[in-house]
C-alpha cells in the first residue's frame, strides 16, 4: 500500500497513515511520502510494534517504509 501525503496540513498526514496502519496484517508494508519528517509518527510506530525506514527524496520529501512486526 502507498500513501502520498504531500501537500496536506498536519494532522491529516498522520491521521491518514494511522488509519491505513490499522488495516495492516503482520508483515504488511506501507510506504508513505510526506513533505516533512513525521517525528510524532515515529514514536507511535515504535509503541505499536512497527519497524520503519526513512529515505530522503531528491524532491525534498521523505519516503517512509513501515512494516508491521509480530508482537
Identify the residue ranges that each predicted region occupies.
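Sterically constrained small-residue positions within well-ordered secondary structures
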Residues: 23, 43, 55-57
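Low-complexity, flexible helical/coil segments
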Residues: 12, 38-42, 66-71
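An N-terminal amphipathic alpha-helical segment
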Residues: 1-24
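Short, structured protein-protein interaction patches enriched in aromatics and acidic/basic residues
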Residues: 31-51
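C-terminal edge-of-domain segments
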Residues: 49-71
Amino acid at each position: 500500500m502507498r500513501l502520498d501525503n504531500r501537500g496536506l496540513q498536519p494532522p491529516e498526514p498522520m491521521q491518514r497513515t494511522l488509519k491505513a496502519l490499522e488495516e495492516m496484517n503482520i508483515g504488511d508494508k506501507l510506504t508513505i511520502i510526506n513533505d516533512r519528517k513525521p517525528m510524532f509518527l515515529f514514536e507511535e510506530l515504535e509503541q505499536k510494534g512497527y519497524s520503519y525506514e526513512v529515505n530522503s527524496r531528491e524532491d525534498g520529501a521523505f519516503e517512509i517504509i513501515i512494516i508491521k512486526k509480530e508482537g
